[in-house]
Curated annotation (Swiss-Prot):
Homotetramer. It is found in: Cytoplasm. It catalyses: Release of an N-terminal pyroglutamyl group from a polypeptide, the second amino acid generally not being Pro. It holds the Pfam family Peptidase_C15. GO terms for molecular function: pyroglutamyl-peptidase activity. It comes from the Bacteria. One of its GO terms (cellular component) is cytosol. Belongs to the peptidase C15 family. Keywords: Cytoplasm, Hydrolase, Protease, Thiol protease. This is Pyrrolidone-carboxylate peptidase. It comes from Coprothermobacter proteolyticus (strain ATCC 35245 / DSM 5265 / OCM 4 / BT). One of its GO terms (biological process) is proteolysis. Removes 5-oxoproline from various penultimate amino acid residues except L-proline.
Amino acid sequence: MSRILLTGFEPFGGEKVNPSELAVKQLEGKTIAGLEVVAGVLPVVTVKCIDEAVKLIEKYEPVAVLNVGQAGGRVELSIEKVAINVKDYRIPDNEGNQIRYAPVVEGGPDAYFATIPVEKIADSLVEKVIPASVSYTAGTYCCNEVFYGVSHYLRNNKPGVLNGFIHIPFILEQAAGAKPPRASMPLEVIVKGLEIAVEVVAEGLEK
């Protein structure tokens, strides 16, 4: 059976949980639209985040890769269109590195577009009454770094493998009692949204 790799991240920035980790773990081992879901958790550490993602790709040999990350402040699922070759951390990573104005890959292309059907995923989520839209900025932190690094690796080593990135909001337990108030989404809605995204990716693979 063909596999799709979903990755989340460990908690960072003082948070006790990372909803991306929780969400991908809930889908791990399931079969969705004929694809076996395999999953992994990436460190929020420059370079190591890409290295771990590549190890998972080489281990599982998926037909598609969907990286997922927390974006506090977003109010919906953001289906990312483009990864840029920039690292500019507003906060340190989990090993204290605060990279400024550096490339993800020295000499690499300025950007990579997602190869999953970004617009169709966003439209399908909205049709299923899950707030979502296409996003044109994945930031300049570890999420974008992984999105770019995975894109670069796949284009150069496994060009037939589809990939993309989805940013998700905080979950309720991160928002309850927060000052100032935080936007949030129930974890079960996020999980359902990712399941729909996998279904759309699977449809694209069949064509």
